[in-house]
Amino acid sequence: MDWKGRDVISIRDFSKEDIETVLATAERLERELKEKGQLEYAKGKILATLFFEPSTRTRLSFESAMHRLGGAVIGFAEASTSSVKKGESLRDTIKTVEQYCDVIVIRHPKEGAARLAAEVAEVPVINAGDGSNQHPTQTLLDLYTIKKEFGRIDGLKIGLLGDLKYGRTVHSLAEALTFYDVELYLISPELLRMPRHIVEELREKGMKVVETTTLEDVIGKLDVLYVTRIQKERFPDEQEYLKVKGSYQVNLKVLEKAKDELRIMHPLPRVDEIHPEVDNTKHAIYFRQVFNGVPVRMALLALVLGVI
């Protein structure tokens, strides 16, 4: 696979070999970064970050990754500061921005926006989240985190908790896990179950999938619990949101039933689904997970720029 110039739009576009290439490159760059403090692979290259939706971790970690590689960053953190506010189309925005940069990272509220950007642009485009659809770079850092913590992904029991209907991180992660020998536990309110087409696809690919509404029934089996917030901004009706708000909270009492080896992940931001008292336990790895976004995004940028 020639990575130079490649778009990163959906985890569905990846083979297992592609995923392993990214994880191995991230491991190498993390090691080099610790040894040298600053790398020069992307010297003279410019990243444009186009964020039409709010972001803290994804935007800052991409910008940090590009700086760590020796490159530069331009872009905007909200659509209101761009000509989109004047009515400019996404197509024209992309065609304009690519004149200034070597790679584009885009987050957009509309599903399919990243794919459209990739079709229009001559430079590589990386999807930083499109609506409730896909978030492939989060998935890659999640897999990297699991592999760092356990030394493997195969053989693990992994639970996804919370908003499995609108949560793009869990859609991408579930699809990527079909490449591995894992058992998947889907824990959500009835209203927020994983979309049927995704569950059917997982089972067709031979994955053992268990669906439940009760965390306490399965937490003792899990190696990884991946927690998500209930995403108020994705609900078409506030009454629907209020029905499921606060459905779950991971706290010390819940963790009494957990294995010592259980590791808790969260793509963040959190609301109240993980109590702060969990932060200092051996189970919590969500802030280490945040750090892992930098080497993984360094790897993706270096690969699509063809500098590594």
UniProtKB/Swiss-Prot annotation:
A Gene Ontology BP annotation from the UniProt entry: amino acid metabolic process
Molecular function GO terms recorded: amino acid binding; aspartate carbamoyltransferase activity
Catalytic reactions of this protein: carbamoyl phosphate + L-aspartate = N-carbamoyl-L-aspartate + phosphate + H(+)
Superkingdom, taxonomy of origin: Archaea
Enzymatic class: transferase
Positions contributing to L-aspartate binding: 86, 168, 229
Pfam families membership: OTCace, OTCace_N
Entry keyword Ribosomal protein: no
Biochemical pathway: Pyrimidine metabolism; UMP biosynthesis via de novo pathway; (S)-dihydroorotate from bicarbonate: step 2/3
Binding site for carbamoyl phosphate: 57-58, 107, 135, 138, 268-269
UniProt EC number: 2.1.3.2
Record keywords, A-Z: Pyrimidine biosynthesis, Transferase
Free-text function comment from the UniProt entry: Catalyzes the condensation of carbamoyl phosphate and aspartate to form carbamoyl aspartate and inorganic phosphate, the committed step in the de novo pyrimidine nucleotide biosynthesis pathway.
HAMAP family in the cross-refs: Asp_carb_tr
Family to which the UniProt record says this protein belongs: Belongs to the aspartate/ornithine carbamoyltransferase superfamily. ATCase family.
PANTHER family (UniProt xref): ASPARTATE CARBAMOYLTRANSFERASE, ORNITHINE CARBAMOYLTRANSFERASE, MITOCHONDRIAL
Oligomeric form and interacting partners: Heterooligomer of catalytic and regulatory chains.
Protein name as it appears in the record: Aspartate carbamoyltransferase catalytic subunit
